[in-house]
């Protein structure tokens, strides 16, 4: 079980870099920072991360 858990954690961390799942998570803020600038994009990402954390 411990190994499985470790693998899962690793997979999540690795997929965070580039994975279709991120597309869905980024989809919401995509519209946001699409209107704004690069700075807004960083802020949106942070907000999204916090929002997901709260969920």
UniProtKB/Swiss-Prot annotation:
Read off the PROSITE patterns from this record.
Answer: TP1
Q: Which residues, if any, are the signal sequence?
A: none
Region annotation (Disordered) ranges: 1-55
Comp. bias regions, Basic residues: 1-42
Q: Which InterPro entries match?
A: Nuclear_transition_prot1 (IPR001319), Nuclear_transition_prot1_CS (IPR020062)
Sorted alphabetically, which keywords does the UniProt record give? Chromosome, Developmental protein, Differentiation, DNA-binding, Nucleosome core, Nucleus, Phosphoprotein, Spermatogenesis
Gene Ontology cellular-component terms listed: male germ cell nucleus; nucleosome; nucleus
A Pfam family hit: TP1
Give residue numbers for the modification (Phosphoserine). 9, 40
Question: Where in the cell does this protein reside?
Answer: Nucleus; Chromosome
Q: Name one GO molecular function term.
A: DNA binding
Q: Which GO terms describe its biological process?
A: chromatin remodeling; flagellated sperm motility; heterochromatin formation; negative regulation of DNA-templated transcription; nucleosome disassembly; positive regulation of protein processing; sexual reproduction; single strand break repair
The organs and tissues expressing this protein are described as: Expressed by spermatids (at protein level).
User: What's this protein's function?
Assistant: Plays a key role in the replacement of histones to protamine in the elongating spermatids of mammals. In condensing spermatids, loaded onto the nucleosomes, where it promotes the recruitment and processing of protamines, which are responsible for histone eviction.
Task: Give the family from UniProt.
Answer: Belongs to the nuclear transition protein 1 family.
Its protein name is: Spermatid nuclear transition protein 1
Identify the gene encoding this protein: TNP1
């Amino acid at each position: 079980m411990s190994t499985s858990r470790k693998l899962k954690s690793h997979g999540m961390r690795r997929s965070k870099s580039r994975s279709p799942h991120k597309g869905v998570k980024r989809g919401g803020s995509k519209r946001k920072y699409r209107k704004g600038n690069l700075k807004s994009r960083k802020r949106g990402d942070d907000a999204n991360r916090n929002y997901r954390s709260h969920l």
